Regions:
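Flexible, Gly/Pro-enriched loop and linker segments at secondary-structure and domain junctions
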Residues: 23-37, 76-81, 92-133, 264-313
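Non-catalytic, low-complexity flexible loops and terminal extensions
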Residues: 43, 52-60, 64-142, 340-359
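Single conserved hydrophobic/aromatic residue that forms the stacking wall/gate
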Residues: 2-13
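Structural preference for long, well-ordered alpha-helical segments in enzyme cores
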Residues: 1, 58-65, 140, 151-163, ...
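Helical lid/core segments from catalytic subdomains that handle acyl or acyl-like groups
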Residues: 130, 197-281, 288
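Extended, hydrophobic beta-loop-alpha segments that form or line the acyl/peptidyl-thioester binding
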Residues: 305-359
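Acidic/histidine-rich catalytic neighborhood
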Residues: 177-210
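Gly/Ser/Thr-rich phosphate-binding loops and adjoining beta-strand/alpha-helix segments
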Residues: 31-44, 118-186, 318-319
Length: 359
């Protein structure tokens, strides 16, 4: 919403958005910061390199940044609230992976089976198609309940169905549709760290027959995720990652060899997923600031092997499902939102201008 400044901010460096989102951040032209803050009209943007933090940490920082901006531009807020960090803003920077490492051995490996890749004609270099779908949470929750699944599983299932229908044309295929679903590990371990603390799961659909129905796909995705989102599986993820870090033999390997190995691991892991769907949860805003905040979006950048990604964010009674893509073809986006509408979930769509045909 419009925030009219009530005091001068001329001494504060401000950068207006003038490019597509999620472009490369040239560190040496950005004061060596691995994040970038810009604005556009009524919107404040934060772009973060994942090495700094995950979605929860990024949202915590952005929320505190917006709070500070509102206090600076509204004298009544500054007088009432002072110039302190919000009481529920964590400054904890512990390595929760190491803290929760038990040393127990698990037979855990990252999968390397290649998945379906979304390919086609690309948009111009640096261009990114961004489509937001606004959904009413009470209606969406009731519909997901009809299928006996969570909202996250319901939406991931419809996205997998859209890939199956539009990209595979409802035909069998030897490679699986594998959608990476990051899991926030903080609730599992009682952590409040602002550093990265998440685990990777995969919602897998094996297209082994023709004409799957949306109900069948949602059920397959639900089964796939339930097998993985367990405390024991999260323990195994932490154990696998931290044990490699603590392995003395691996620590003695020359850095250039490690770099080559990491590139191979990254490439193998990237090609094992068709896309990503990440849910950053509900944005919690203090009552005093709510009149000034209207909505929140999350946009994911593209990575090797993944030319389309999705993010889910919520504020009050509205959920925003965002699809970012560097492909010209918008058939998957259209199928996704049309399927939701056909199932009785109204959708309001907004795009950045690269995907008008979705409307």
């Amino acid at each position: 919403r419009d925030v009219a400044p009530s005091r001068g901010l001329g001494d504060v460096y401000k950068r207006q958005e003038n490019t597509y989102p999620c472009l490369y951040i040239p560190v040496y032209q950005n004061n060596n910061y691995l994040f970038r803050v810009t604005y556009y009209r009524k919107r404040i943007n934060l772009e973060v390199f994942h090495v700094l933090t995950d979605g929860m940490g990024g949202i915590t920082f952005l929320r505190e940044l917006v709070y500070e901006y509102l206090r600076l531009t509204h004298d009544d807020l500054m007088e009432k609230l002072g110039d302190e960090l919000c009481s529920d803003t964590s400054l904890n920077k512990e390595d929760s992976y190491v803290k929760n490492y038990t040393g127990k051995k698990y037979k855990k490996k990252y999968k390397t089976e290649r998945a379906v890749r979304l390919t086609g004609e690309f948009l111009p270099p640096k261009a990114l198609s961004v489509t937001h779908g606004y959904l009413n949470i009470p209606i969406l929750k009731a519909k997901a309940k009809e299928y006996g699944v969570s909202i996250n599983t319901f939406l991931t299932g419809i996205f997998a169905y859209s890939i199956y229908k539009e990209h595979l044309h409802s035909q069998p295929y030897k490679k699986p549709i594998s959608i990476c679903v990051p899991v926030n590990l903080r609730p599992f371990y009682g952590s409040i760290t602002t550093k990265n603390f998440f685990g990777m799961t995969a919602a897998v659909l094996r297209a082994d027959k023709e004409n799957y129905t949306v109900e069948e796909v949602i059920a397959r995705i639900d089964e796939s995720l339930k097998e993985q989102i367990t405390k024991e599986n999260m323990d195994s993820l932490i154990s696998y990652n931290v044990s490699n870090q603590k392995n003395l033999m691996l620590r003695m390997v020359p850095l250039f060899v490690k770099n080559l190995a990491m590139k191979w691991v990254y490439r193998s892991s990237a090609l094992a997923n068709t896309s990503t769907v990440t849910n950053v949860g509900s944005l919690q805003i203090r009552e005093d600031y709510r009149p000034y905040i209207d909505k929140m979006h999350v946009v994911l950048s593209m990575t090797k092997g993944q030319n389309m990604k999705c993010s889910i964010s919520s504020y009050e009674d509205t959920l925003v499902y965002t699809i970012s893509s560097k492909l010209k073809d918008q058939s998957i986006q259209k199928c996704f939102f049309r399927t939701l509408s056909e199932l009785g979930v109204p959708v309001t769509i907004e795009t950045n201008g690269e995907a008008y045909e979705v409307l």
